[in-house]
Amino acid sequence: MTDLRLFTSESVTEGHPDKICDQISDSILDALLTQDPSSRAAVETLVTTGLVHVAGEVTTSGYVDIPQIVRDRIRDIGYDSSEVGFDGSNCGVTVSIGAQSPDIAQGVDRSYESRSGSASTDAHDLQGAGDQGLMFGYASRDTPVFMPLPIYLAHRLAERLAAVRHSGELSYLRPDGKTQVTIGYEGLVPRTVDTVVLSTQHGPQVSQEDLRREVEEHVIRPVLAAAAEIGIELDSRDATLLINPTGKFEIGGPKGDAGLTGRKIIVDTYGGFSRHGGGAFSGKDPSKVDRSAAYAMRWVAKNAVAAGLADRLEVQVAYAIGKAAPVGLYVEAFGTAHVPEDRIVRAIRETFDLRPAAIVERLDLLRPIYAETAAYGHFGRELPDFTWEALDRVADLQSAAGL
């Protein structure tokens, strides 16, 4: 097979320093929403050797024990002793949390439409967007869950790497790790696994030869086999497998690298297959359209591709701070549209209410569901709480598009 185009995406495990921070921020958000569903939060976390610092803005009627949440999450990930380089029980935890700016709150609590007298009687007109910005959603027919194949496989490898560590199947593994998958495409069709890169932290008791053999046997091959079982047909016979290509990886986690919330936005979304508006997700309550509108755009794109409007679809929405109605909606079908793109835009407008309050209500986002999103991808996992993955607007879109 010749003339394949190679596309690569990466993922990281829950023990990667940046992902530790995302999970801490979202665990704090979940605790706040459990006590007060109307909580406003923007929680940022930094981890480094022996220290966690939590900062940001929170407005809530509840109370949460942030240091305890931090320690519990770190231990759950697997950093529970100095032997692995970080210990949730003994690390330092500092907290600097203030209230949300009243200048921001005024635009969310009372929208531009409400203040200017142009609001309708619809309650969804009363809440403005929490910031200006642009958000993208994407879907394709690469996989049964309508995700690009490279990021889908990278996430499954990272999940499997964590699973065999937690189960004790590969007891020498430690929490930090990264995966990367390069897929060969013939036109728009994925054909081959070209390269898999997997780097995993480990204890000193295992040789690199044994680690590479066992990671291939217990992680890589099972993931590729599982993909085949759900109809993803790929030729991996000539795939290059690079497992810990630098050699030993004993120093990892916050001892090896500092971590920050929001530094894995491409891992969190589509692995580079789609554009990104720049806003991170974790630690933000759903009044922040960086998060809620990105979830809505995934919902839109997935339903539109499932409805047969296009085989690949990227959608963009844009907001002005304090304004309820979006200021822009754009679609790109990359030459795969089955109806004109202007008709796709009209069908989306007819089918989806993209005002922030409507998104929050339709997707039921004022719930403590966010820690689960913070590792292995916000999209493409059809879990019960991931309402943005539901294919519940397919018939409506087909009708609106005249299919």
Curated annotation (Swiss-Prot):
InterPro entries named among the record's database cross-references: ADOMET_SYNTHASE_CS, S-AdoMet_synt_C, S-AdoMet_synt_central, S-AdoMet_synt_N, S-AdoMet_synthetase, S-AdoMet_synthetase_sfam
Needed co-factor(s): Mg(2+); K(+)
Alphabetical list of Gene3D superfamilies matching this protein: 3.30.300.10
Flexible loop: annotated span: 100-110
Entry binding sites for K(+): E44
Annotated residues for binding of ATP: H16, D176, G177, K178, K248, F249, D257, R263, K264, A280, K284
Annotated metabolic or biological route of this protein: Amino-acid biosynthesis; S-adenosyl-L-methionine biosynthesis; S-adenosyl-L-methionine from L-methionine: step 1/1
Pfam families tied to this protein: S-AdoMet_synt_C (PF02773), S-AdoMet_synt_M (PF02772), S-AdoMet_synt_N (PF00438)
Co-factor binding details: Binds 2 divalent ions per subunit. Binds 1 potassium ion per subunit.
Localization terms from the record: Cytoplasm
Source superkingdom: Bacteria
Enzyme class: transferase
Region (Disordered) residue spans: 106-126
Binding site for L-methionine: E57, Q100, D257, K288
Broad class of the protein's primary localization: cytoplasm
Catalyses which reaction(s): L-methionine + ATP + H2O = S-adenosyl-L-methionine + phosphate + diphosphate
An annotated Gene Ontology molecular function: methionine adenosyltransferase activity
Gene Ontology biological process: one-carbon metabolic process; S-adenosylmethionine biosynthetic process
Annotated HAMAP family: S_AdoMet_synth1
Family classification: Belongs to the AdoMet synthase family.
NCBIfam families: metK (TIGR01034)
Function field: Catalyzes the formation of S-adenosylmethionine (AdoMet) from methionine and ATP. The overall synthetic reaction is composed of two sequential steps, AdoMet formation and the subsequent tripolyphosphate hydrolysis which occurs prior to release of AdoMet from the enzyme.
Cited PANTHER family: S-ADENOSYLMETHIONINE SYNTHETASE
Binding partners and assembly: Homotetramer; dimer of dimers.
Name recorded for this polypeptide: S-adenosylmethionine synthase
Annotated organism of origin: Clavibacter sepedonicus
Chain's gene name: metK
